[in-house]
Design a protein with these regions (language model features):
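Catalytic loop of the DD-peptidase/beta-lactamase superfamily, centered on the K-T-G motif
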Residues: 1-417
Length: 417
């Protein structure tokens, strides 16, 4: 509890003060007037808008897992704190909720005279793009996508995602202020050269949630990249793996990852328009790929070396220590009434495919101590014993089953009826 003497003396006054410093100003960071991010030591922001407009320091820490979302806002000089943990939404929604509640509290106790109006981006007339601006066209990347930016003479900018065909093209229009603005006027894009040969897309976005609140996110959204030129053998090696889903094998039996199909698998995909890339990763050699962009905040997070490794006679995809096995290397689940299987060397989870021979059959599993299993159809997890209990499950026709143990040699008895 914060009221306990131990809590009050856990950090020295000097350390508490250091935590509030604007550490983001010490490194690569976009120029910003306002944003929900501005790193301190451990804080996502140490000068959250709009509190800083009143000279009030607001410290923010948010976070998201697959199933839960949290946000903490502290006004240390006013003895006010907001915290929310939700099982839906996002940490940003929680932040907006806390922002509005704290502003209302400050208004009620007389600390501020009025709640500020929503942040507005300056409007400017559309204009043709000068040659200097048009020269910025090309390939740009962050850790989640690679886009091709085209800038037309009339000032229209089109950003097309090359790594996800489900993402629609984004359109912006050049303005007399020198920035590119989307149709709604909620997103402003500019190009920034760092003086050392790197070119960034600087983005200011209005975050607006009806009946909840408004804020702004300022970031370097992309870094300009060039097409890599790996060897023919390296390109062919990754193309041979393209189109295959890789599934997690070294998560624990209680991991959230197995509860959501999205978080338990990873797709390797090459693209004719992006030779030298596998997804957003630059191909280094036959076994290694890496995203070399360096961006602060969200656009550059979760960047890890991607390697193909051999373990215990099988090929795995290693992404920052998380191991995945290709669906092409999975066996079909045994169709006999009774079967026993064991976790392999390394204690990795074992994945199996279900087909027409399994469809409609009921599966019961006798689990080892602390073991778990999960069943998936083509779209989602339909049963995870850690969440749903160890009960019988009807198997889908085109699905997958994973058995998760704690150590090598853990035994699972499978009964099909």
């Amino acid at each position: 509890s914060p009221s306990l003497p131990e809590a009050r003396t856990f950090l020295s006054d000097q350390s508490k003060k250091a935590l509030r410093n604007k550490e983001y100003l010490r490194g690569l960071w976009p120029k910003q007037e306002a944003s929900i991010f501005g790193y301190g030591l451990g804080w996502d922001s140490v000068d959250l808008h709009p509190f800083k407009e009143y000279g009030i320091q607001a410290l923010v820490k948010g976070g998201d897992t697959n199933l839960y979302h949290g946000s903490l806002i502290v006004l240390p000089d006013h003895n006010l704190t907001f915290a929310a943990l939700t099982s839906g939404g996002s940490s940003v929604l929680n932040l907006l909720m806390g922002q509005e509640l704290l502003l209302s509290t400050l208004l009620a106790n007389g600390t501020i005279d009025a709640i500020p109006p929503p942040y507005v981006l300056e409007a400017s007339k559309r204009s043709q793009a000068p040659q200097e601006q048009r020269s910025y066209a090309g390939l740009y990347a962050n850790t989640t996508m690679v886009v091709r930016i085209v800038i037309e003479n009339n000032g229209k900018l089109i950003a097309t995602c090359l790594t996800d065909e489900q993402t629609p093209p984004q359109e912006y229009y050049h303005t007399e202020s020198g920035s590119f603005v989307d149709e709604a006027g909620k997103n402003h894009l500019t190009f920034v050269e760092d003086g050392q040969g790197k070119l960034y897309v600087h983005m200011v976005r209005i975050i607006e949630v009806p009946d909840l609140g408004t804020n702004v996110l300022t970031s370097y959204e992309f870094e300009k990249v060039t097409l890599p030129t790996p060897s023919v053998h390296a390109q062919e090696a990754w193309e041979a793996r393209s189109g295959a889903w890789y599934y997690a094998v070294n998560e624990g039996p209680s991991s959230q990852s197995y509860h959501l199909m999205l978080s338990t698998r990873f797709l390797l995909s090459t693209n004719e328009e992006l030779p030298g890339f596998v997804g957003t990763l630059r191909i280094i050699d036959e076994q290694t790929a890496f995203n070399e962009v360096q961006l602060p905040v969200l656009a550059g997070r979760d960047n890890a070396l991607c390697r193909i490794v051999q373990k215990y006679g099988k090929e795995y995809l290693d992404i920052g220590g998380s191991l995945f096995i290709s669906e092409r290397d999975m066996e079909a689940l045994d169709t006999r009434r009774y079967s026993i299987l064991a976790t392999p060397a390394g204690g990795y989870a074992r994945w199996f495919i279900t087909d027409s021979r399994h469809a409609g059959k009921t599966m019961q599993v006798v689990l080892p101590e602390s073991g778990a299993f999960a069943v998936y159809d083509g779209q989602e997890c339909i049963h995870y014993s850690t969440v749903d209990g160890n009960i019988s499950v009807v198997l889908p026709q085109e699905g997958k089953v994973v058995f998760i143990g704690k150590a090598a040699g853990d035994l699972f008895t499978v009964i099909l009826t």
